[in-house]
Design a protein with these regions (language model features):
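Conserved, well-structured interaction surfaces
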Residues: 7-8, 12-26, 47-122, 136-150, ...
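Acidic, serine/threonine/proline-rich low-complexity intrinsically disordered regions
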Residues: 129-132, 139-142, 194-215, 374-386
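C-terminal substrate/ligand-recognition segments
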Residues: 307-386
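Short, flexible active-site-proximal loops enriched in glycine and acidic residues
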Residues: 122-128
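Short, flexible loop/turn elements at secondary-structure junctions
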Residues: 131-134, 256-258, 313, 382
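An aromatic- and glycine-enriched ligand-binding surface/loop that stacks and positions planar moieties
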Residues: 1-52, 86, 125, 149, ...
Length: 386
């Protein structure tokens, strides 16, 4: 640790690795999407041939489910690296106080986010705030959810005090208002626990009422709103242009690119060999996570003619690349929802029914399992809905 933490560049490299771990395939780069999507009313699993996927879609998850394991282990990998940084950052003597505070504030924000994801998915779990030097040290008893949430709030409050103001931060890195925005999100979660008590979230563990937690959520969100630290992008479609990174609407965004190999999540949403990306001999676009028919119907019933649909869904039909080496797919056209086998325009088309796709995350230069598409963890639009 002495060598790594001997210079500001070394400390920054450790912080960068924290971002790398949380955005890798075990986290926002892939498996977290799968774990949290298939069982919801808005998303659906198209292919039910995989046992572990069906378990997630039906919320009947076996103890050895690999996706749950990946997410759990990946979050603790981030946490362990943050813990190491927080323990050893003091070894760096050549760092300004402002730089020290900025790095520690970002690290605490990432640790809070990691535990926030874990506690909402798994309930009570081990709280580890020091780097584990051995397997034995990493095996700790579970901590109750009220204490976990208290520690999450503590990290976010410290991040609020340590992170720089907007304008004093480097582009693409969170400033202090991100911590305040996440505090609002945490208090929303606590209000929901109080309003909907039940295992694994024992509402009796929390001393405030749902109304009080809603008020705390509102107060923190209102502070962010009044700060004018964020704003909505004028054109909704611009959010999904892969070159538009870290817009004024982005509160926290994971930087992903094909060099680091941290962005396999895109192919979880797109169809294989789709002409929108130049794949030729690989079907890395699996399209495993799809909007449900009900979600598509509700959107179109509520907002008929909504221009946002074009940049949100890939629907009706799509065509495969003409350069695909496999001639069975080359140039082939597929009809997808809202077309069904009863109303396909071309009656020679396969009678299989296909769900629509999400088309928000598209890198047209994508040729393999990774891409240059960032993932926005938290948008200002999300905060405005608090």
């Amino acid at each position: 640790p002495e060598d790594v933490y001997s210079s500001p560049n070394g400390v920054q490299a450790v912080l960068n690795s924290c971002y790398g771990y949380i955005s890798q395939s075990n986290g926002y780069g892939g498996y977290l999407h799968m774990l949290l999507s298939w069982h919801t009313p808005t998303m659906q699993l198209q292919n039910r041939n995989s046992t572990y996927m069906v378990e997630l879609a039906t919320m009947n998850v076996a103890v050895d489910n690999s996706t749950a394991d990946y997410v759990y282990d990946g979050a603790y990998q981030t946490i362990n690296t943050v813990n190491d940084l927080l323990m050893n950052i003091g070894l760096c003597s050549g760092m300004s106080e402002a730089e020290h505070n900025r790095i520690e504030g970002e690290a605490r924000l990432l640790r809070a986010l990691s535990y926030f994801n874990l506690v909402r998915i798994f309930g009570a779990l081990p709280y580890i705030d020091r780097p584990a030097a051995s397997i034995e040290e990493s095996h700790k008893p579970r901590t109750s959810i009220d204490r976990i949430y208290g520690l999450i709030i503590g990290d976010l409050e410290q991040a609020w005090n340590m992170l720089p103001e907007k304008g004093a931060h480097a582009h693409g890195r969170p400033h202090k208002w991100a911590a305040k925005a996440f505090l609002a999100k945490v208090y929303v979660a606590l209000a929901c626990i109080k309003e909907h008590p039940g295992e694994p979230f024992d509402a009796a563990l929390f001393d405030k009422s749902a109304k009080e937690y809603w008020q705390l959520a509102y107060d923190n969100a209102k502070e962010v709103y009044d700060s004018h630290a964020y704003s909505l992008v004028p054109n909704f479609a611009d959010l999904w242009v892969y070159t538009n990174k870290h817009t004024e609407e982005s509160i926290l965004e994971m930087e992903m690119n094909y060099v680091t190999g941290s962005c396999p999540f895109m192919y979880r949403y797109l169809p294989g060999y789709w002409e929108g990306v130049p794949l030729t001999n690989s079907s890395n676009n699996y399209g495993q996570i799809r909007p449900s028919r009900e979600a598509w119907d509700e959107h179109n019933d509520r907002y008929p003619g909504d221009w946002r649909e074009e940049c949100t869904y890939l629907d009706y039909k799509y065509k495969c690349n003409t350069t695909v080496e496999n001639e069975n797919y080359r140039g082939k056209q597929y009809y997808i929802y809202p077309y069904t086998k009863e109303n396909y325009p071309d009656q020679s088309t396969s009678k299989y029914e296909y769900l629509p796709y999400l088309r928000k995350w598209v890198d047209p230069t994508f040729t393999a399992g990774n891409a240059n598409v960032n993932f926005i963890v938290y948008r200002y639009a999300d905060l405005l809905l608090t």
